[in-house]
Design a protein with these regions (language model features):
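Short alpha-helix
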Residues: 170-184
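A short SAM/SAH-binding and catalytic strip from SAM-dependent methyltransferases
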Residues: 109-122
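A short acidic, Gly/Pro-enriched loop at the edge of an enzyme's catalytic core
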Residues: 99-110
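Conserved class I S-adenosyl-L-methionine
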Residues: 1-43, 54-58, 75-78, 141-163, 202-204
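Class I SAM-dependent methyltransferase SAM/SAH-binding core
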Residues: 46, 52-100
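Conserved Class I S-adenosyl-L-methionine
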Residues: 52, 189-260
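A short glycine-rich, Lys/Arg-flanked "PGG" loop and its adjoining helix->strand segment in the class I
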Residues: 124-136
């Protein structure tokens, strides 16, 4: 089974939890993304990995049209259900994968991808497609969890993420984002970076992590080297928590970012 099929199956199963999760529906980064976009009423927008539609809906009041795409039928069903509650008339959802977007070259003023890229088995193929569908003066805004540059910490974080969620591939480091963006002809600007608080019980329940895997995760966290525990700001009481890293990034075609 390839990465896309693993991701599709995982989110078909867990989609309702993502529809209501405060991290995705009410995260401060959602407002940061909208503000960074400076949207215009005539814009065409594409939301890649739209999930339950939170980013799609946040942008819709400010632009002409937003299309949300996702590979999970379960997620798209949640998005359509959420759309019916909002009465928006400029939003569409359809099935698509990030590496084969069914749209014309240079069609969109803005492409977004929020908390989805860590499910991609490689950044470059998806970024190449995003670049292809962007207008020459368009922009790409991404929000995602990121790995620190420290290899030990990065591997530990991704180990626990993969144990909790089989569809998790890798929390890409900023250096990897920069390299992949440059390889497809865009430049990257880091707009915001912050610590993302994680409540362990919510984290595992949202993905319906098996009891066996939950026990393994607890053991990994409890027996992690002290330096890792401190870096992740781990707590055990009154509830188990830790902190990841997240970033808001802007990519623009090199021709658009170059001085005249």
């Amino acid at each position: 089974m390839n990465q896309e099929e693993i991701t599709r199956q995982q989110f078909d199963r867990t989609a309702p939890a993502y529809s209501t999760a405060s991290l995705f529906g009410r995260g401060q980064d959602l407002q940061w993304l909208v503000e960074a976009a400076h949207p215009s009423p005539d814009w065409q927008v594409l939301d890649v990995g739209c999930g339950a539609g939170h980013t799609t809906f946040a942008l819709a009041p400010f632009v002409q049209q937003v299309i949300g795409v996702d590979l999970s039928a379960g997620m798209l069903a949640e998005a359509e259900r959420n759309l019916s509650d909002r009465g928006l008339t400029n939003v569409w959802f359809q099935a698509a994968i990030a590496t084969a977007l069914p749209f014309a070259d240079q069609q969109f003023d803005l492409v977004t991808c929020r908390f989805a890229a860590h499910h991609f088995s490689a950044l470059e193929p998806a970024l190449a497609e995003i670049h292809r569908v962007l207008k020459p003066k368009g922009q790409f805004l991404a929000v995602d969890v990121i790995s620190p540059e420290d290899p030990e910490l990065a591997h530990f974080i991704n180990r626990i993420e993969q144990l909790r969620d089989p569809s998790h591939y890798w929390e890409w480091q900023l250096s990897q984002w920069h390299s992949a963006i440059a390889a497809v002809g865009m430049s990257l600007e880091l707009l915001q970076q912050w610590r993302l608080p994680i409540d362990f019980e919510d984290w595992v329940s949202r993905q319906q992590t098996s009891p066996t895997a939950v026990t393994q995760l607890e053991e990994l966290l409890d027996h992690a080297p002290l330096a890792l525990q401190q870096s992740l700001a781990m707590t055990r009481a009154p509830q188990r928590t830790f902190q990841l890293w997240a970033a808001l990034m802007r990519g623009v075609p090199v021709s658009a970012s170059s001085p005249l």
